[in-house]
Every structure is written in C-alpha cells, then in structure tokens.
C-alpha cells in the first residue's frame, strides 16, 4: 500500500491531524456557542453554517481545478488554523461569525484530503486503503476524547480551541513539505449543475449518497444532543463524558481496517445491512437507560458505534469503487451529506423536541429512522459491486 508511495503516508498523517483538531472541538461546539447565543439558537448557527458550506462546496471543484490540489489544501488549512486561533481568543458574540467560517473551512480540508486519498490509492485495494485511512483518523478521535475530558476538568473551552489551532498549524507545516511537487490528475471539466445531474443519474452513487446521508444524520444528532443529555439531564461531569466518548469511539479504530480489507473480497451489501441493524438496535436501547452509570453508557454508546463504523467504511468503499480520481465533483457532492445533515437534523430536532414528552425520546426516533438503512442496503445487487 505505502511501498513507493510516500505521498500516501503524508496524507494519512494529515488525516490524523485534521481529525485530532476536529475531535477536540466537535463535542463542545454546541455548549461553547450556547454561552454566546443561548441554547435555543445553537441549532440556527449550525443551519446557517451548513447552508454556507453547501454553497461553497458547489464551487469547490472549479476552484480546485484553477488552484491545484496542493495550493488549495495549504490555503484552506491555513485559514482554518487562523479561525481556530481567533475562536480561542475572542470573548464576544462575534466569535459566532468566526465559527461559521471555521465550519466551512473544515469541510474544504476534508474534501481536499478525500481527493488526495482517491488520487494516490489504487482502485483494486480501495477497501484496504479506505479502511486503514478511517482507522487512522478515528484513532485521533479516541485520543482527543481521552485528553479533552481531562483538559475541560482543569481549563475552559478556549484552551481546547487553542490546542486545535496548534494542531492545524502542524498540519499546515506537514502539508507544505509532505505534498510538495505533487502532480494533479486531469480533472473533469463539468459545470456544477451538470455534475449533480450526472451524479444522481447513477443509481450506485445515489444509493451511496442516501446511505451516507442517513449515517451523517445519525452523527449530527448524536454529536449535538448526546453531550447535552448526559451533562444537563443525567448530571455527568465532562471528565466522565470524556471517558464515555473515548470508549464509544473504539470500534472506529478496531474494526474499520479489517472490514475494509474484507470488503475487497466480499462486497458491501451484507455488512451494510448488519451495520444498520446494530446501530438501530443499540440506539433504541438508549431510550431505556436513565441511570447515571459511566460503564452502562460507555457500553451502550460503544454498541451504537459498532454499527456506525461498519456503515461508514462500507459506504465509503462502495462509493469510491464507482468513481475515478478525476471525478472530484462527485466527491464534493458525496461529502455534502454532512452539511445537509447539519441543516436537516437541527430542524427535525426542533420539531421533535417540541412534541416529545421527554428528551430521551430522541434516541427512540433516531433508532427507528436507522432501520430504513436496512432497506436501502438491501437494494444493492451483486452486479452493483
């Protein structure tokens, strides 16, 4: 995999650093923002950030063709580092505007790394490469949760954002030296709307998009509302939440590489069905857990992520098997499932939270919704893989 491919090693390191930065801040963003906007307006900030991200992602393939992958990555990561520094320093509501810019920039860096993995990996070993890449970036999430819970028990949110800035500064340095003299592929010259038409005319890409959208919706609800439920409703401390989330994320490190390797030989259909079944059942079980016990919540959330880890790697492998390295516009569309989810999930949650009798009903609704993924996965045929 890495033999004679030093650029791929650099990309994996960059993926690790980016994920470390994201993991340090993702689970505290909602609590941090609520201090400036009020708890009720946090969803609105996420919606605005996501809509702006979708608008920018629409033009990214054209920007990439003009700038080249290397320069695009340096500019977007440099601006991300700057925005994180400002977030760590600002103490006024203006920090919300900087957060929105940072939110958009993170998606640009994620897109750039996705494109780089596609360029420097061979299609025949796509499952192995994607599985290992996901394991590496999710290792960063585990380590960050282990550290951030302890950090928050001693310092404030601003400290974590400053640590995230330092990580992105390192990212910029490694990107500058590690990807020098890279050669871009000949990108498709397709207009924005036409790329959407081509994407959604392909049943395999549409199916991959729908599966990933459902997974991203799951992530958004979990990222925004699980910390709130554990902290505000069940009385867990941030140190306890850090331990819970560290254990919760272990499946992403332990099983994604073997699963990716396995998918190269077997295919994705059966594993996707299994993943959605496990994620749905485990999420439904959260509705019934009302005790303040770290080990119970750690085990329950660990189970939800076993399903999510299976879905994530199989969805990515299935998608990337059906595109070529020059199809950068398709990657932009596929990755917009995350900002789309950050629009849909808070809107749905706003309606749901005004109708349900208690907060824990969100897990009952989310678990039921994940059952639809079993049907989606069952529509994959052997000829589609």
Kindly label every feature range from the protein language model:
Residues 1-8, 180-211:
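Juxtamembrane intracellular "pre-TM" segments in multi-pass secondary transporters
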Residues 2-51, 206-211, 215-244:
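Helix-loop boundary and gating motifs at the non-cytosolic
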Residues 16, 94-109, 213, 295-310:
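Hydrophobic core of transmembrane alpha-helices in multi-pass small-molecule transporters
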Residues 56-69, 152, 255-267, 353-354:
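Helix-to-loop junctions at the C-terminal end of transmembrane segments
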Residues 65-77, 265-276:
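Cytoplasmic membrane-interface "Motif A"-like loop-to-helix N-cap segments
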Residues 78-91, 277-291:
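C-terminal ends and interior cores of transmembrane alpha-helices
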Residues 103-137:
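Cytoplasmic helix-loop-helix junction between adjacent transmembrane helices
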Residues 153-166, 353-370:
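A membrane-interface helix-boundary motif in multi-pass transporters
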